[in-house]
Amino acid sequence: MASASKRAIIVLALLLGGCHHLMAQGDADSVSLRPSFGLDYTSELQTNFSWTKWVNLLELSAEVHLSRKFSFNLASLSAVTTNEDYLARDLQVFSNIEVWNIPFALTVAVFTWHINDRHSLFAGIRRIDEDYFCSDALSLFTNSSCGGFPTITANCPVATYPVSALGIHYAYDRENLAIQASLYNGTGAYEFTGRYNVFRISPQNDGLFALGQVEYRHHDSHYFLGASLYDGDLWWEDKHDMCPSVWAYAEQKLTPGLTLLAAYGHAFDSDEFCKNFCGLGATYTYKKLDFGLFSDYTRILEVDEWATELTCNVNLTNYLSVQPVLHIIKTDDETNCIGVLRLNVSL
């Protein structure tokens, strides 16, 4: 009897321990499955030292975990500017938040399948610059070309800020290697109805845009190689054409604070607006200061443009930063000097 009682006590203890483990696991899962929300507000004063304008961008986001393997993401943007005219007649657009007034636009609405720790797949509405051209060094700079090389964005009406498109995206990520590939509707949009609505997918009318990229990481340095193929109507002519392009850029860490940046993009079609883009720069981090210098060259519409950006991002808190920027842009025979003061709040 004593041995039977002992066995019963042991079984009861194991059951209680198992229940406790399951309850703890359930609590952990409930925490991990809680939705998360984000807010990013960017305010920018721009001046060409003759007149000034004010641009504001509000981005809202939410992520809902449907299970441990499936999630749903939503994001939107709203933009307001005091003047829709450009301060400079530059070809690349010196500010990556420069846009017309947009009361509300849906930028992300995707279902993601987290296949395992390395593989994921999503389908839905998204911008390509959410996944491409968004590395740490490039993201410091405000020039639009650092968020999407003009060998793509100046040639094809694809889904880059502020427009989005329906697409599918696959990603593979491990410690030193990341591979991604995407297929999008060929024309980006932000409206909810009509010919240019964001829910539209029409390869015959809008074309298709396929792209992929490989990233190699080594000792905090990053090396990227990518290619894309656009099949649809080009910006400047109402006819179907194929527009292949390649790009490469590297972020070489020299010291814990200093990184060198080199970028190149090439489009192969002889009739393209922009065939080549190249840039060199550096970033340096000291305490809460991020310094950056980037200079690039491109040729668009048979016009040469050199653009140089000098910037310093001051991280005041984990949520607030201030970033003064100076742009010196030489477009053909015209030189513009643009000053920018950017405020960013991220919650």
What residues fall within each predicted segment?
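Outer membrane beta-barrel
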Residues: 55-186, 276-279, 290-296, 300
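Transmembrane beta-barrel strands of outer-membrane/channel proteins
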Residues: 35-43, 74-78, 121-127, 181-185, ...
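Outer-envelope beta-barrel architecture signal
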Residues: 27-37, 66-72, 117-121, 166, ...
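Outer-membrane beta-barrel "beta-signal"
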Residues: 335-347
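Transmembrane beta-strand segments of Gram-negative outer membrane beta-barrel proteins
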Residues: 26-48, 72-74, 143-144, 150, ...
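Solvent-exposed loop/turn segments connecting transmembrane beta-strands
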Residues: 47-52, 128, 160, 204-206, ...
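Residue-level signature of outer-membrane beta-barrel architecture
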Residues: 26, 62-66, 112-113, 125, ...
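Detector for outer-membrane/organellar transmembrane beta-barrel domains
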Residues: 68-69, 176-182, 215-300
